A protein has these predicted regions:
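Flexible metal-binding regulatory segments at protein termini and peripheral loops
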Residues: 1-127, 150, 232, 248-249, ...
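Conserved ATP-binding TGD loop and adjacent catalytic N/P-domain core of P-type ATPases
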Residues: 16, 267, 431, 511-513, ...
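Transmembrane helix-loop-helix hairpins at the membrane interface
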Residues: 85-240, 351, 716-721, 727
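Membrane-embedded alpha-helical bundles of multi-pass transporters
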Residues: 110-124, 153, 172, 411, ...
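Juxtamembrane coupling segments of multi-pass membrane pumps/enzymes
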Residues: 71, 75, 181-185, 190-193, ...
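Conserved cytosolic catalytic loops of P-type ATPases
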Residues: 26-49, 199-200, 231-325, 422-467, ...
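ATP-driven catalytic headpiece of P-type ATPases
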Residues: 89, 308, 429-475, 505-586, ...
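Conserved catalytic phosphorylation-site environment of P-type ATPases
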Residues: 289, 348, 383, 396-470, ...
Length: 836
């Protein structure tokens, strides 16, 4: 997407005009204009010159945004500051003249303020002073007239047109009344001129312009706050970097840093580029990028990111990504691109905005004509028409969606949740199914030791010492898990001899003359005797989805160490939160059914789909899409097709660049709880957009009839043009202020979650409990039943056991496949005999 800065837009009618003009350019496939940021995003093959020409011909200005988002944004911010300063000066000058005008026009009549003696009874002089003061206010605010009438001549009237027409009509009519009064005074004296004083609307013209300027200032200030999150990100990047050249430290501008440069970072400094630590260790605060408040330890080989803060030690790093390629720049670009797109919900407002101003002008003319036909004076009829013009506000409609999108995206960026488009921000909250890839998403993606079970007569330390010696020379992933666990528990590797790795089976080596063996249950069973109690333990571990590793020395079993790709601590909570939102959670994995169900049970998902090959995930997602709107969460290369196929693709931040490119939402952390947080933020943003649109529509729906005088005969309600201008000024301010409430949304708090979908098992297979019937001898009474029941239900995979001593049976319901030997052992340990 190519982005452009657009100048001269003042309301939704302007943005609609620009969008319509650019969309007609050959080669443009999509165009989205953002009134909030005065920017435009264009996709297609059209050249920049053709696009800029189309905008210029529509009466506005356009320029290509800078290549670096940080510089472009800073330039845009400077333009906004200058515009705000100019607006402030205009307002102060307008207020000075308005106060004097109100003193002469209303102060004497309403509050009895004294007038200079030469003005007492001199109505013509009073009118002339009001004309001059009003003219001064009009000159100060001439931009409304230049923009408004230029747009009218081009056939694309905007909000400035409404203001210009309203103020001009009030000024023109009052000027005509002044000339008529002068003529009457010349021919009939002061008494003949007196009635014309009530026909002056000079103060209305000046008040309209001043109040609209007040509203524009409030709106500009509030709009500035909507981009605070993006501005804070841009300010994170350091302006200077310390590079090592010729063994010396040199300070250079950060933008001159090149890939491969060695740079130093002292405690308290920001890291200037993405890179890798080559010397030193420290704790780095990465909260700016990930939202994670706890510092992350860094040492040689660790990755570091630009704009994160080195907190303690001295680091030397090699730059790998600089300038616009850093993670920070990509985040800024992503947030900026998302703000340049439009949400589907904005389409209605866009359609209305395109015809809003011409319709309002038509209503104003009809209003004037109707009141004249009803016998009212020209002044009264004109006042009603002016009220219609100045109360109507297309800005509120135009801002309703983009302000909420901007604030929502900013909130997401603060919390490490990046929505690539406005569509993804709107649609994420509507998903009814979330499919989670198991490895790296629900689980940590790397094996870890979960159980250490020494054999009888063997100490825990003895088992770990032998396992450490044997696994130290293995390159298997499970060996790394065992070594890490041994290191944490004080077991150091010892030098072995005659080390042999038998593919698919196990390991063998000699340590101090003793023969060590390690490997699968089957491999060790063939080499040494395995006691029944340890065999039962290995069956239990396998049933829980773990991999038991057995170790023996000189033919004697030392014990079992189990390893598994353990689930992340926050995964069950994340799944629970999603289910509490009414979202069905499905786990996809290539693992076998038994392992998959064990992990699924720990995570608490609704459904497990096991045995899914990498290229089969996309087909599963296609099938699930028939049952509802689906989000796919993954991190690997083989997840990319599924992420693309899903309605919303969510990439875990620790994943690959390919997965991130294919996704609609990127989670900078690897926390699964960020998925419900993204849904929560999306729902809050969509709710805010609906509130804004409701306010904008209801304001105009009620305000225009009130201004036209529809309720005068029914309730006696009418609206002075000055109050109409005040209402118009506040309408946009209210919409922007409402959007700012999104800053207070607690995206990680489930306190206010509610279900918008009902989780139904209608479309997916039930997780039916397996049932096993055991025949047992030796049970004589209810106490026997209770003992057997308690023993069976103590097993983790047993849901319930119905035991009958009269029938001599136990009906066992299982949540996962469980070896019969495990059930049998549990019963026979209580001195009963299982016969079938």
């Amino acid at each position: 997407m190519q982005q452009y800065d657009v100048t001269g837009m003042t309301c939704a009618a302007c943005s609609a005009r620009v969008e319509k003009a650019v969309s007609k350019v050959p080669g443009v496939t999509s165009c989205s204009v953002n009134l909030l940021t005065n920017s435009m995003g264009v996709e297609g093959t059209a050249s920049s010159s053709d696009i800029i020409a189309a905008v210029t011909n529509a009466g506005y200005g356009a320029s290509v945004k800078g290549a670096k988002p940080e510089k472009s944004a800073k330039s845009s911010e400077n333009v906004q500051k200058n515009a705000f300063r100019s607006m402030k000066h205009r307002l102060i000058a307008s207020l000075v003249f308005l106060v004097i005008l109100m003193y002469f026009s209303m102060g004497h009549m309403m509050w009895g303020f004294p007038l200079p003696p030469f003005l007492e009874g001199n109505h013509t002089a009073m009118g002339l002073i009001q004309l001059l003061l009003t003219a001064a206010v009009m000159v100060i605010n001439q931009r409304f007239f230049i923009s408004g009438f230029r747009s009218l001549v081009r056939g694309a009237p905007n909000m400035d047109t409404l203001v210009a027409l309203g103020a001009s009509a009030a000024f023109g009519y009052s000027t005509a009344a002044l000339f008529a009064m002068t003529d009457a005074q010349l021919h009939g004296g002061a008494e003949a001129a007196m009635p014309f004083m009530d026909e002056f609307y000079f103060e209305s013209a000046a008040m309209i312009l001043t109040l609209i300027t007040v509203g524009k200032m409030l709106e500009a200030r509030s709009k500035g706050k909507t981009t605070d999150a993006l501005k804070s990100l841009m300010k994170l990047a350091p302006s200077e970097a310390t590079v090592i050249r010729g063994g010396e430290e040199l300070t250079i501008p950060a933008e001159q840093l090149a890939v491969g440069d060695i740079f130093a970072v002292k405690p308290g400094e920001s890291i200037p580029a993405d890179g890798v630590v080559i010397e030193g260790s420290s704790a780095v605060n990465e909260s700016a990028l990930t939202g994670e408040s706890l510092p992350v330890d860094k040492s040689e080989g660790s990755k570091v990111s630009a704009a994160t803060i080195n907190q303690s030690g001295y680091l030397r790093c090699r730059a790998e990504k600089v300038g616009g390629d850093t993670a920070l720049s990509k985040i800024i670009q992503m947030v900026s691109d998302a703000s340049a797109t439009k949400a589907p919900i904005a389409k209605l407002a866009d359609k209305v905005s395109g015809v809003f101003v011409p319709v309002v002008i038509g209503i104003a003319l009809v209003t004037i004509a109707v009141w004249l036909l009803c016998g009212q004076t020209v002044g009264y009829s004109l006042a009603r028409g002016i009220s219609v013009l100045v109360i109507s506000c297309p800005c509120a409609l135009g801002l309703a969606t983009p302000v909420a999108i901007m604030v929502g995206n900013g909130m997401g960026a603060k919390n490490g949740i990046l929505f690539k488009t406005a569509v993804s921000l709107e649609e994420t909250g509507k998903v009814s199914i979330v499919a989670l890839d198991k490895t790296g998403t629900i689980t940590k993606g790397e094996p870890a030791v979960t159980d250490v079970i020494p054999a009888a007569g063997v100490t825990r330390g003895e088992l770990l010492s032998s396992a450490c010696a044997l696994e130290s020379r293995s390159e298997h992933p499970l060996a790394s898990a065992v070594m890490a666990y041994c290191s944490e528990n004080g077991a150091a590797p010892q030098e072995t001899e005659e080390f042999t790795a038998l593919p698919g089976s196990g390991l063998s080596a000699k340590l101090n003359g003793s023969a060590l063996l390690g490997g699968s249950v089957k491999f060790i069973s063939e080499k040494s005797e395995m006691p029944d109690e340890l065999r039962a333990e290995t069956d239990r571990l396998s049933g829980e989805g773990k991999t038991p590793l057995c170790f023996a020395r000189d033919g004697k079993l030392l014990g079992v160490i189990a390893a598994a790709d353990v689930i992340k601590p926050e995964s069950p909570e994340a799944v629970k939160q999603l289910r509490n939102m009414g979202i069905r959670v499905v786990m996809l994995t290539g693992d076998n059914e038994r392992t998959a169900k064990a992990v699924g049970a720990q995570a608490g998902v609704d459904e497990v789909i096991a045995g899914v090959l990498p290229d089969g995930k996309e087909a599963v997602i296609r099938s699930l899409k028939e049952q509802g709107k689906i989000a796919m969460v993954g991190d690997g290369i083989n997840d990319a097709p599924a992420l693309t196929r899903a309605d919303i693709g969510i990439a875990i931040g620790a994943g690959t660049d390919i997965a991130i490119d294919a996704a609609d939402v990127v989670l900078m952390n690897s926390r699964l709880t960020d998925v419900p947080a993204a849904v929560r933020l999306s729902r809050a943003s969509l709710r805010n957009i609906k509130e804004n649109l409701f306010w904008a529509f209801i304001y105009n729906t009620i305000g225009i009839p009130l201004a036209a005088g529809v309720f005068v005969n029914l309730f006696g309600w009418s609206l002075d043009p000055m109050f109409g201008a005040a209402a118009m000024s506040l309408s946009s301010f209210c919409v922007v202020s409402n959007a700012l409430r999104l800053n207070f949304v607690k995206v990680h708090s489930p306190a206010h979650d509610r279900k918008i979908h009902h989780i139904s098992n209608k479309h997916h297979k039930e997780e039916k409990s397996m049932e096993v019937t055991m025949k047992i001898e030796g049970m004589m009474c209810g106490h026997c039943e209770a003992a057997v029941k308690k023993a069976l239900e103590a097993l983790p995979t047993v849901e319930s056991a119905e035991v009958s001593h009269e029938k001599g049976t136990a009906v066992v319901k299982l949540s996962a496949e469980t070896p019969f030997e495990t059930l049998k052992k549990a019963v026979e340990d209580k001195d009963y005999k299982v016969i079938g």
